[in-house]
């Protein structure tokens, strides 16, 4: 695992972080160089951003040492008015973690139009005072991310605290 500081709105360091995430084959633990709030010294309250993707599943697997030691794990999915096909798998992951003794809940949270997926994730982490955000890193073309926004790039540009990313 690589541990790496990132600076808010610093594309040079964010590009280094992205290369490590997408090319190393290992999870990357990121923290803001100048955090807005005090960084946790242990990961007791963990948020897992779940979208049903292979990178999200890999992130959960990579984070197991942290998840087993946590006091509370919240797996959350962003929803809109349509049913989420990933919801069933999210509940299964939560049940599996619970069977291993992890204090875990799964919840689907409605994402409003005023939030990008990145700002939605950042708000969730802040609202639940999460010590660590675990999420899969998914890469889009730079043009698509520029137009639509991307969760990975967004949290790298504005890290809410400790983030563990896996691809």
Residue ranges of model-derived segments:
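Intrinsically disordered or low-complexity boundary/linker segments at protein termini
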Residues: 1-76, 158-167
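Glycine-rich, Arg-bearing micro-motifs that act as flexible, cationic patches
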Residues: 3-19, 135-154
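Secondary-structure boundary/capping motif
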Residues: 12-13, 55-56, 85, 117, ...
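Redox- and metal-dependent alpha/beta enzyme cores, enriched for Fe-S-associated oxidoreductases
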Residues: 52-107
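Charged helix-capping and loop-helix junction motifs
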Residues: 88-91, 119-122, 147-152
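Short beta->alpha junction loops
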Residues: 107-115
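Glycine-rich phosphate-binding loop signature in dinucleotide/nucleotide-binding domains
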Residues: 124-130
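Conserved active-site loop/cleft motifs that coordinate metal ions or position small ligands
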Residues: 132-137, 163-166
